[in-house]
A protein has these predicted regions:
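Bacterial N-terminal signal peptides
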Residues: 8-19
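A short helix->beta-strand "capping" segment at the edge of beta-propeller domains
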Residues: 24-38, 208
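Beta-rich, blade/repeat-based domains predominating
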Residues: 36-53, 80-96, 100, 105, ...
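Beta-propeller domains
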Residues: 55-74
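A short loop-to-beta-strand structural motif that recurs across blades of beta-propeller domains
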Residues: 63-65, 105-107, 152-154, 193-195, ...
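Short loop/turn segments that connect beta-strands within beta-propeller blades
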Residues: 67-72, 110-114, 156-160, 199-202, ...
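Beta-propeller fold detector
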Residues: 74-78, 117-121, 164-167, 206-212, ...
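Blade-level signature of beta-propeller repeat domains, shared across WD40, Kelch, NHL, RCC1
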Residues: 262-302
Length: 302
């Protein structure tokens, strides 16, 4: 039996399969987006319901920035002393989640009050790196050990309890749930592999298999569009690669710098991709033909 969360999201995906109206515009061409003020740790972009971008690496390592539609950045909130943010995600209620790689935490932030709470702290975590979120609010966290070249995967249930789902992997980094909620993608940066796990009852991870391997360059953050195409940053190559659900490379986009660290979909229609690029210490953006999965979830939650 297919659970109701899969049916609901599947129905939404079907409603979005009709051709999306595309007016005369330039697609797949990156342009500088953000103002100055970021540093080489710029990472973890995520968009809220309005399409506004948030990311880390703005001045102090604790700061999370909000970037206005015209590219101006301002400090939104600072994490507690001793913390450093990386991946950011929003749930369907609008709450923000931040991976804290120095404090071994995942924080939850109320955007309205800017109150920060520790959702989970686990000393077994190396350094929570990036986050993915399922439609029911289950979080997944990649957890690399860069020194040893190994990594773990965590599932964080809706009660804030962390469950180690995989260990002994390579340097786990970018992570994303498929639109139908049945698969979890995770890449290993150093090993240049993307794995896919089956997601079972309660969000538990099942069998895994290699989805895609590359002969060179590394990986960082990843996101899906509404059709299930996976957009992955190629760290060292300076591109974002678009990969179909059948593991076919559909397109590769130059992002104007060699070290893209992560990406998200945003804007009013969900068809603007924002990329954090560490070499130039800025955000770049480009337009695409189909909206992102995050945008689809925002639409479904309205």
């Amino acid at each position: 039996m297919i659970s109701s969360r899969f049916v609901a999201l599947g129905s939404l995906a079907l409603s979005l399969l009709a051709p999306f109206p595309i007016h005369a515009e330039t697609l797949w061409e990156a342009r500088p987006f953000s103002s100055e003020g970021f540093n080489k740790l710029i990472e973890g972009p995520a968009c809220d319901r309005s399409g506004t971008v948030f990311c880390v690496g703005y001045g102090d390592a604790r700061n999370i920035a909000r970037v206005t539609p015209d590219g101006r950045a301002e400090r939104f909130v600072a994490l507690p002393e001793g913390s450093a943010g990386n991946g950011i995600r929003f749930d369907r209620a609008g709450r923000m989640y931040v991976a804290d790689y120095t404090g071994h935490n995942v924080h939850r932030i109320d955007p309205a009050t800017r109150q920060i709470t520790v959702l989970v702290h686990d000393a077994r975590m190396n350094q929570p790196n990036d986050l993915a979120i399922a439609a029911d609010g289950t979080l997944y966290a990649s957890d690399p050990n860069w020194k040893d070249g190994t990594g773990q995967l965590w599932r964080i249930d809706r009660k804030g309890v962390a469950h180690r789902e995989a260990e002994g992997m390579g340097t786990t980094n970018g992570i994303e749930v498929s639109p139908d909620g049945r698969r979890l993608y995770v890449n290993e940066s150093v090993q240049r592999r993307i794995w896919v796990f089956d997601i079972g009852r309660g969000g538990r991870l099942g069998k895994r298999r290699i989805f895609k391997e590359f002969p060179d360059h590394g990986f960082d953050g990843m996101r899906c569009d509404v059709d299930g195409n996976l957009y992955a940053t190629r760290h060292g190559k300076g591109t974002v690669v678009k990969i179909s659900p059948k593991a076919e490379i559909l397109r590769e986009i130059d992002v104007l710098g060699p070290h893209p660290t992560n990406l998200c979909f945003g804007g009013e229609d969900g068809r603007t991709v924002y990329v954090t690029e560490a070499h130039a210490q800025r955000l770049v953006s480009f337009r695409v033909d189909r909206p992102g999965l995050e945008w689809a979830r925002w639409k479904a939650a309205r």
